[in-house]
């Protein structure tokens, strides 16, 4: 089997920021990395779930709403993926994400936290979501990272896979 592209990122050197994870078939997947993998705690599931609801709501109502395909959490709980059509640079996504995080910090409730609207409506934590949002906002404004550190992987057959 081929190595999945996201597994070629050196997670021991990955910093919070915004990265282009992949570009294919007219879609761009952005990696909104909130915490430093394997060095900081992952975002708590309830806070991440609230962040998902809030970010999805904001992005789908933003100036970029017609280009938003998907907003959702990474399985490792260290960030969010945003999939877009259109031509957005990392700086465009940084600006949009900063605006989104500022909006989240002003919210008093998480949208769609009813049993008919959410599959796990009790798993939410707005205060912790806002704490994570404030920390990520500060990082995007003062310590921004957008270039992946690549990892070389030797496959079972001895070939070297490096996604450059």
Can you say where each PLM-predicted feature lies in the sequence?
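Non-catalytic terminal extensions that flank enzyme cores
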Residues: 1-38, 153-154, 160-164
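Active-site-adjacent, His/Asp/Glu-enriched structural segments that form or flank metal-binding
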Residues: 73-145
């Amino acid at each position: 089997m081929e190595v999945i592209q996201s597994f070629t990122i050196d997670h021991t050197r990955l910093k919070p920021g915004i990265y282009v994870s992949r570009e294919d078939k007219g879609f761009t997947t952005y990696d909104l990395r909130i915490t430093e993998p394997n060095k900081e705690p992952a975002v708590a599931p309830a806070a991440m779930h609230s962040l998902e609801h809030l970010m999805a709501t904001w992005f789908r109502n933003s100036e970029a709403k017609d280009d938003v395909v998907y907003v959702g959490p990474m399985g490792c709980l260290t960030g969010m993926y945003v999939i877009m059509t259109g031509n957005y640079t990392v700086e465009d996504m940084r600006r949009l994400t900063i605006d989104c995080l500022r909006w989240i910090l002003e919210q008093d409730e998480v949208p769609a936290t009813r049993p008919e609207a959410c599959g796990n409506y009790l798993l939410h934590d707005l205060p912790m979501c806002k704490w994570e949002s404030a920390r990520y906002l500060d990082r995007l404004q003062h310590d921004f990272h957008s270039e992946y550190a690549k990892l070389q992987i030797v496959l079972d057959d001895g070939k070297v896979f490096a996604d450059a």
